């Protein structure tokens, strides 16, 4: 069995596990730490180091880390719901040096999309699949015939005078006390806008709230088919591990 470690850094939590790269299944306990207040790189690095120790990770393990930012060549180019210190930060090199292992850094929604393409709801789907992760913000991944187009960031599209994630993320639902019907109307407004621009063949909705898709899918009224993420909130972990295992084996 070939495995790799996947770490998913979010605005509120950092979680990780060992992943079977053939099946996409977690083959260890999933461990979660709270994201340190302020989300500064050094503090997050310390939390990741502790998490890897809990997982029994070794320097030889392929290790992927997904993060809520545009990531190019291992450098985080933006910062969503974390410290601005991440902007233009050499994340992969810094983490690799401190953790004494090769690190593959990737955008969190892109990792989730790759996981769904390899093992989940987008497996074998042709055409354009748009995956949206509904959490602290709205992440996005575009997959064309299963191939990732990275760093799309369409959660920042403007809807009704505000960014989509300010109005339609799961955090917005919780912050404003919206019931699922009211939230579904906001999601429909956003999804309809995305649909008009990109004409996707399938939407996949992920993030922790996807476990409750039966509660809000009935209120989503768009023409494009919609599926919940098959890997639920583990998709980032699985995708990060898969990308690390394949990138570092090349």
For each feature predicted by the language model, list its residue ranges.
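Basic- and aromatic-lined ligand-binding clefts that recognize polyanionic substrates
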Residues: 138
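A charged helix-plus-loop insertion that forms the helical arch/lid used to bind
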Residues: 76-88
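ATP-binding/phosphotransfer module of carbohydrate and carboxylate kinases, centering on a glycine-rich
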Residues: 1-62, 71-75, 95-100, 115-130, ...
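General beta-strand structural signal in soluble alpha/beta enzymes
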Residues: 103-108
């Amino acid at each position: 069995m070939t495995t790799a470690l996947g770490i998913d850094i979010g605005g509120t939590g950092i979680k990780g596990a060992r992943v079977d790269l053939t099946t996409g299944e977690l083959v260890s306990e999933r461990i979660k730490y709270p994201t340190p207040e302020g989300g500064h790189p050094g503090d997050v690095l310390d939390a990741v180091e502790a998490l890897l120790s809990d997982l029994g990770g070794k320097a030889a393990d392929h290790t992927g880390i997904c993060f809520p930012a545009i990531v190019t060549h291992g450098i985080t180019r933006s910062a969503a719901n974390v410290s601005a210190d991440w902007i233009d930060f050499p994340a992969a090199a810094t983490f690799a040096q401190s953790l004494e292992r090769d690190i593959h850094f990737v955008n969190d929604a892109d990792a989730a999309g790759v996981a769904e393409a390899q093992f989940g709801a987008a497996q074998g789907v042709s055409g354009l699949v748009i995956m949206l992760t509904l959490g602290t913000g709205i992440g996005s991944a575009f997959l064309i015939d299963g191939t990732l187009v990275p760093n799309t960031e369409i959660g920042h599209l403007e809807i009704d005078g505000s960014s989509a994630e300010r109005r339609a993320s799961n955090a917005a639902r919780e912050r404003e006390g919206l019931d699922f019907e009211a939230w579904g109307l906001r999601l429909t407004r956003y999804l309809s806008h995305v649909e008009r621009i990109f004409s996707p063949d399938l939407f996949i909705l992920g993030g922790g709230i996807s476990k409750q898709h039966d509660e809000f899918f009935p209120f989503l009224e768009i023409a494009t088919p919609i599926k919940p993420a098959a890997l639920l909130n583990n998709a980032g972990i699985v995708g990060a591990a898969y990308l690390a295992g394949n990138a570092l084996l090349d």
